[in-house]
Amino acid sequence: MSSKKIALVGLGYVGLPLAVEFGKKRSVIGFDINQHRINDLKNGVDSTLETTSEELKDAVHLSYTTNLEDIKDCTIFIVTVPTPIDKHKRPDLTPLEKSSETVGSVLKKGDIVIYESTVYPGATEEVCVPILEQQSGLKFNKDFYCGYSPERINPGDKEHRVTTIKKVTAGSTPEIATEVDELYQEIILAGTHKASNIKVAEAAKVIENTQRDVNIALINELALIFNKLDIDTESVLEAAGTKWNFLPFRPGLVGGHCIGVDPYYLTHKAIEVGYNPEMILAGRRLNDNMGSYVVDQVSKLMIKKRVHVVDANILIMGLTFKENCPDLRNTRVVDLVEEFGSFNCNVDVYDPWVNKDEAVHEYNIKPIDTPVEGKYDAIVLAVAHNEFKELSLEQIKAFGRDNHVLYDIKYLLKADEVDGRL
């Protein structure tokens, strides 16, 4: 097995850490269509901050390319491209389809194509395999084979890394399932779980994030109820958390490449086969509306303080979808920006983690370098970056005018230190 060369297709948050680990042990070619990304990696720079320059150096058998010719000799192809949703919240399989076309054009007899992208159950064999067959002229499970091992990367998490998270694996035949499982065992210290088939592995991945999404939706709904009852949500959760089996979820904006996206893949397939998934979609609607709810609460607090909402200066602290990482994918902080904008507010976004060019390109939001003291009518703590945790209450309030509103989404401050929080 170790003599087989791997092509890693897609070098983002998922693909690069995987390529680095395999690249410590065997020949790996990292392929990506983004030339700027490839140039950075060749210079030892990972803009996602998932791997350090030292880790890149340790992957002595790893090389990078945008040239399709360079991966023709590979016999194992691991595809780690994004699987987003479109503006109608439907699965957008374009990156997966395009990458399948790419791999199919260089596919040879005996090759194995392993997908890591999150999809609905059946997508690998219903969508990807026909493309591979069409592009290559080869027959599935006769000339080439497929595997599936869903990614479990948690961006920004330096404790749970690719090697320390148990890996689910599957293959299109029992023999290939074993081969795929043994491949991942080379690098996964936490061990593997060989699923009975590809559909089972696909379903396992998509429900991991659906379960989390539904749980957060429940807590978000409780936060809405407790707000009307004038009860502090965190105090309730701390009290309930003293029972051993109470799950430690917190309310908030639900974004990112997984939790706010994956449920729509499952519900899409459910509707396709004639089942209307009520609870999952109800949870999605609730979570998707939290940005609007926060702006509504901040606006009411401003009105109570006789602060004009129209033309108000608003400071939003944080733009990434989670703390301590530069990942902007599907961040729901943009909902705050848009909602405040609908009231003709002047919104400044401050986030020391983000790439400003990326923020402008993705959301037409240009983050400021530093907040201006004494400028803002309302301050919203949206992301729990360490840089914000290190600020004192006085330092945060210094950004506001004398009569400003301070709203805390992430419980960075105590209840009696802010005007409102989830």
Language model features with spans:
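Structural/interface elements that position substrates and couple domains in central-metabolism enzymes
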Residues: 1-422
